Structures are given as structure tokens and as C-alpha cells.
């Protein structure tokens, strides 16, 4: 019997495991990312640090720019749409994007509903702060989950919090008695069958990446040690002094996350990292967008 579209999309996302996905704003950056060993790139007009700095409404990027990036690399290309904006998603699907990120980094288009991702052929990535959010997005059809963190800050603390929360809640479900599953599903606001999957398997039904504030090789290794199966790096690379070297170092850190000697070597002489923000100083908390 043939594999259904949902399983195919989950398998596509599985192929990115262990990798680093980098935000790029043009084809030159995309080529640097691919040469550094990125497993995919995220095409967008402004990295989160600039969206945060400039303010205003952040929307889907220009399809022309996305096409130029897609034509410049051989690795998968992702692009972001606003939460709930299914027409932006239809446009990206039409232009042949590899993955769509329904992203809280862009200004939400709908404050009540997320996109029905099962209506699309292209796989979706979604952010989550906890297990309930993750399972709701998977229930809607997401093929990959990432922490929300706080994008554009260069501060990994929120991503750490979200990853620890998800992993702690997975352990709680795994250790529960079978008769507790329905109550847990009610508490989490998550589909019963997905809570049951977590109870039986001790993990999410899809890959779980880290995102939001990853700025150094050590940050990438930390997130993988905490349970992430790969890492998104947004502003952290191309807002730093030496993007090529930092990109390579973060890819190495994701591969050798358990080897302090390698991490020491790749962390040396990277130049200035991106400017970081204290979370308490931020006006807009992107992670609070969506539910």
C-alpha cells in the first residue's frame, strides 16, 4: 500500500535531522549557507533581528526573491507565511517551495485560527512553546515542529525554556498510566491519538528542531543536547562579523554536539557575534503569537 501524503511529508522532514537550517535574504547568502553545510535555507526579505528593529507589518516575502534563492542552491528551500494566512501558503505551494513555515516571526494574519495544513501537499513547519501547542499544530498537519524561542534576539534562553518544557511534558506523558491519557489530552488541549502516540513512543510524531536566539556553536550544541533534532539559525549568522566561518562552525557544532574538544576548536576566532537583546527589554514577544 502506498504512503499517504502526511507520512511522505514527515519523512521529508526526517531527512533534515541533525542539520542546520539558515535564514538567507538573497542568493549570495544562500550559496554561503549551502557551502557551509546547511541542510536547508529559509528565504526571507528581512531576518528576524531587522523585523524586530524596524517594526511594522511583516508579511510573506516576494515570490521573485524566493525563486532566485531556489534557483541558486540544490538544498531544500523554506519560506515563511503569516499565522492563519492560507493564501500566502497557496502562493508558496504554487511556486514550488520545499517547506512552509507558518511563523510567529511574521505579523499574524488571523488571531483565532492557524492554517489547515492538511489541505496542502507541501510540508509545514510550526513553532511551539510546549507539548500542547506542538500536538495541536501536528493535529492540523504540521510535518515538523521547532521551538519558538525569541527570534532576532541572539538570546537562547527562551528556546531553552521551550525545549525543556516540551521534553519534560513528553516524559510526564510517557510515565503516565494508560487511563490518564484522556485527561492529559484534555489538559493539553491536544488530539487524543497524538497524546497516545507520545505515551507509546516517548517522542513527538514529527521531528523537533530548535529555533529562536541560536547565535553561537555552543548554543546549537546546547539545544541538541536538550533534545532538539536539528537547529534553525536566523539572524545569528549573517548579523555576525564573519558569516562564512560562523555558519561552518555551527554546522560542525550540530554534528559534534557531544565533543567539547571539537566545539572548542570551532568556537575559536569567529569574530563578533550578532548583538544580543535581554528578553526583559523586548517590547514584542513573538513567541506569544499563535496558540
UniProtKB/Swiss-Prot annotation:
PROSITE patterns: PDXS_SNZ_1, PDXS_SNZ_2. GO terms for biological process: amino acid metabolic process; pyridoxal phosphate biosynthetic process; pyridoxine biosynthetic process. GO terms for molecular function: pyridoxal 5'-phosphate synthase (glutamine hydrolysing) activity. Pathway: Cofactor biosynthesis; pyridoxal 5'-phosphate biosynthesis. Pfam families: SOR_SNZ. Catalyzes the formation of pyridoxal 5'-phosphate from ribose 5-phosphate (RBP), glyceraldehyde 3-phosphate (G3P) and ammonia. The ammonia is provided by the PdxT subunit. Can also use ribulose 5-phosphate and dihydroxyacetone phosphate as substrates, resulting from enzyme-catalyzed isomerization of RBP and G3P, respectively. This is Pyridoxal 5'-phosphate synthase subunit PdxS. It comes from Clostridium acetobutylicum (strain ATCC 824 / DSM 792 / JCM 1419 / IAM 19013 / LMG 5710 / NBRC 13948 / NRRL B-527 / VKM B-1787 / 2291 / W). The lineage of its organism: Bacteria, Bacillati, Bacillota, Clostridia, Eubacteriales.
